[in-house]
Amino acid sequence: MCFPTGLTGYDYEPYTMQNVLQYQGKYYVCGTGRQTLVKNKTSNDNYYLLTLVAIAEEIKHRKAERKTEVILAVGLPLSSFGREKQGFREYLLRKEQPVRFLYESELYEITIKDVKLFPQGYSALALHPEYLKNEPSVLLVDIGGWTVDLMRLDNAVPNAATCRSLELGVIRCIDETAEQVRRNTGLSVTETQIERVLRRESCSMAEEARRIIQENGRKYIERILSAVTESGFDLRAVPTVFMGGGSAILKRHVTAQDAICRPVFIEDVHANATGYERIVEQMWAR
């Protein structure tokens, strides 16, 4: 399942119970807005609460029992994987078991049996081994909401010394674009409108605003490619796998014919999560 990461807490019942988590006496409306950037996800309970929502949504989707045991398969950036792995596992695998909460007025009783952690980006390649076949080196560029994570794989193995995290995520592009549209046209376009125009999808909008958004999108992609090069990677020398929410934007502006890089695109925003699930299934099959 995929949903916006916004989370707003209330002491009193909101006007609707749609997308509402009830946990330890408080109400949390999920999916409105987005999380602020935090260096450490364990610094507050937001990601734990979002995990409970994700579990409930997955159970609804699968029509499974609301009283059940689960194993969580989650990811961390490879650049901080070793440093944060144990703390994040303990953050999700709490002593309070089973966890009881209400989601959309339905009671859930969940026992989190284990937490499996995997490196983001690399796990998605478990779904696409063909991108690594016969390639001694491949660069992975994961364009997320807040950061762009870089990693080179040599002989299909992540090279930890090459990991970089750049604060150039799509959210920065969207915020800067919204401000520029407002200054130049007086229009307060929404984040959703900007995303649709950046992906070249249909959206009714004044042509001047559309032009500004598309121009900012082009400049944003140029900044990413420049930052990757400045980080010591030669985009023309090795194939580059672009993934994450921003890869759909980049694909509209960069092709192999441009001779800027040798791009391959994974546009599925669920690729990391599906990769984690695939790896856990392989572990069980042994």
Predicted regions, residues:
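Short, basic interhelical loop/turn and adjoining N-cap
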Residues: 185-189
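Short, glycine/acidic-enriched loop or turn micro-motifs at the edges of active sites
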Residues: 123, 145-146
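Short beta-strand scaffold segments in enzyme catalytic cores
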Residues: 148-152
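Phosphate-handling catalytic cores of nucleic-acid transaction enzymes
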Residues: 141
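Short glycine-enriched loops at secondary-structure junctions
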Residues: 144-145, 246
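Nucleotide/phosphate-binding catalytic cleft detector across ATP-hydrolyzing
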Residues: 1-138, 157-172, 192-286
